[in-house]
Curated annotation (Swiss-Prot):
Pathway: Amino-acid biosynthesis; L-arginine biosynthesis; L-arginine from L-ornithine and carbamoyl phosphate: step 1/3
Annotated signal peptide: none
This protein's UniProt keywords: Amino-acid biosynthesis, Arginine biosynthesis, Cytoplasm, Transferase
Function: Reversibly catalyzes the transfer of the carbamoyl group from carbamoyl phosphate (CP) to the N(epsilon) atom of ornithine (ORN) to produce L-citrulline, which is a substrate for argininosuccinate synthetase, the enzyme involved in the final step in arginine biosynthesis.
Protein name, per record: Ornithine carbamoyltransferase 1, anabolic
Entry binding sites for carbamoyl phosphate: S53, T54, R55, T56, Q80, R104, H131, P132, C133, Q134, C259, L260, R287
Keyword Transferase appears in the UniProt entry: yes
Amino acid sequence: MNARHFLSMMDYTPDELLGLIRRGVELKDLRIRGELFEPLKNRVLGMIFEKSSTRTRLSFEAGMIQLGGQAIFLSHRDTQLGRGEPIADSAKVMSRMLDAVMIRTYAHSNLTEFAANSRVPVINGLSDDLHPCQLLADMQTFLEHRGSIKGKTVAWIGDGNNMCNSYIEAAIQFDFQLRVACPAGYEPNPEFLALAGERVTIVRDPKAAVAGAHLVSTDVWTSMGQEEETARRMALFAPFQVTRASLDLAEKDVLFMHCLPAHRGEEISVDLLDDSRSVAWDQAENRLHAQKALLEFLVAPSHQRA
């Protein structure tokens, strides 16, 4: 299969990724100015959701509509995948009917197997390992507010989860230093750490991670599928709550990001999203525009670019 996919930040070169987030800024500006731009007219995106989502569905569906195309939502119950059809068989059929497929799933291997058997681009809308579309939005948001992130320091506070893994990949591709503050036993995937080398540092003190940082980011302490661990995680992660006082330790122009949904009073203080240093709402909106840039890159013929 010759289709180009987006399963990981490592699938593209640093220049390609930078081009995507810059294109996201341009497409956002087109939308603000009310200019019609429909390079994906008559194109159809299939969206397979094994994990539910608000932002992922809205951003991809609205993005396809804004670019002139359409999106079809499929829950796990709506396909034969939910009844035991092999992933490879589903991929071969769906990719004959669609122009691209976005999958939000649990096991990352579901994505890689689907992509290996697909004629059309496959996009990782989230897996247990990675969340690369969110990192496109995060990098676009930093670019809009502060310019290049190259050489900056980013602090990730909390669970070494899929978002943290994607931040590690972003540190490699966008050339910034990443400090990860997490409890022992909740570190990010060692394979990603090995790939990043000296770009990533694991610390146990969240204050040390935040000190002098240009960007601070976090996520929920208990992800989907981990509900039975909630009580234990709440106790272990309590010292890792990000607050306004936390941001006071960072650079004066620090930005705070959260991929949302946020649990106010848990991983963040109740008032943090309302702090002037928080750009979480811009970050959420930029899922739409960064993913439009990705869809255009993967699906639209080059001669249709504005």
